[in-house]
Amino acid sequence: DDTPQKVLDSLKKLNIILILNKKPKDFGWSNINLQIHSTAQAIQCAKKLSLKYLAKTRTDCRVYSPNFLIYCKTLLELFPINNNKNARIISTDHSGKHMPYKLGDIFQFGRLEEMELFWKESYWENDIKKIYSGKKIINDTPVVSEIYLTTKYLINLKYVLKWDLECWW
């Protein structure tokens, strides 16, 4: 709604699929609802195109290697999960080692089904009430940003969260 027409016109000339979304009314903690909504809409577009894999970046991420996506796909093939239910999501790490459930959201790569489950559309303030019993901090861990996304994903996988580093490692 608020993108200048001149910008839209220049983007349409690039031979890309341009997805325009209406912004959610509530942006959520640190605009997390904007990221969830736009990513969920992009995943739906990818499903319609019958894509098998998805790379998701934030606007503050740049990938310069022309072989990087092939590298990511090869990593998934070299390190499979031992069950038929799930696959891995490749992610960047930016200080998440000592913060439980902080899988980076700057770059992610995975099978479309897995990425769809991770980015399942729901909104932070609703989930804080429903899933986390109104708690915004659990065992000294803030339920925000990447931690919110990762724990929501793990809960969808029926994983029992312990909210400690041992469980995360």
Each language-model region and where it sits:
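Short beta-strand-to-loop acidic/aromatic patch adjacent to the donor-nucleotide binding site
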Residues: 51-62
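Active-site-proximal specificity loops/subdomain of glycosyltransferases
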Residues: 1-49
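Short, Asp-centered acidic motifs that coordinate Mg2+ and/or phosphate
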Residues: 17, 53, 88-89
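Histidine-centered beta-alpha loop that forms part of the nucleotide-sugar donor binding/catalytic region
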Residues: 23, 58-59, 92-95
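Catalytic core and acceptor-binding pocket of nucleotide-sugar-dependent glycosyltransferases
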Residues: 63-69, 76-169
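Conserved glycosyltransferase catalytic-site signature
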Residues: 32-40, 61, 142-147
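Short, aromatic/basic amphipathic alpha-helical patches
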Residues: 4-15, 68-75, 153
